[in-house]
Amino acid sequence: IISNKSCGNTYRHNTFVACSGTLTLRHGNRCAVYGNWFFGNGQKGTGGIRLIGEGHRVYNNYLANLEGDDTRSAISFQLGLPDSPPSGYFQVKGAIVAFNTIIDCKSPLAIGVGDEDAGDPSRLLPPIDCVIANNLIACREGRPPLARMDARSQIRLAGNLVAGGTDAAPLPEGMRGTAAPTESSPEGMRRHAAATPAPATATADAPFVHDHIDGPPGGTTRDVRCEQLSGVPGTRRALSDPHSTRA
């Protein structure tokens, strides 16, 4: 969908509907991707956000019903090339992925993708010094939140909540179970009802996050997801028709 090719760029408050591909941080470091809506609508090849390079921050995004996997997962971390040429893939380092909501995606999180044509995958460089924290993941039945996890990766998981999925394997440290969000907003977001106890209070792993996808926070703490239920009306919404300019 978008291929970033330089450093320090920001992608925010966009709505992607049934788009084949991903928002890919292809070249460049220290980019921010936040406050975006990705609606796959069950269309083949729809993806989310792919990380390549150093120092990226991906937060407060809503990703739902995406049918892509591997490099077109909802959120994926690319394997890097040793001594990568400018046209290659640089190792993912120091990324923070936090406060995202991932709903009913074929492949929610994939860590260590893109090794199909590598010849010897063991020579590729895994993501290191990364954090995945305070994300809410509602999995499809029988599918785990981590669709792929390169065993060499250095990624710390903290405060993530997972609904549904599979009982075949226990959740890793840094992920625990929760109830699935069941209410639908006018623009198509699945969320917890106001009467439902809010998801757990977030850990302090992304101190740079001061608002949420709908607008400024309505309290002194953050919930584990891209939004926060409160009495404060949101100021941002996903586009709901081709002529809307609310985002």
Question: How should each PLM-predicted stretch be described?
Answer:
Residues I1-A179:
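Glycine- and acidic/polar-rich repeat regions and solenoidal domains
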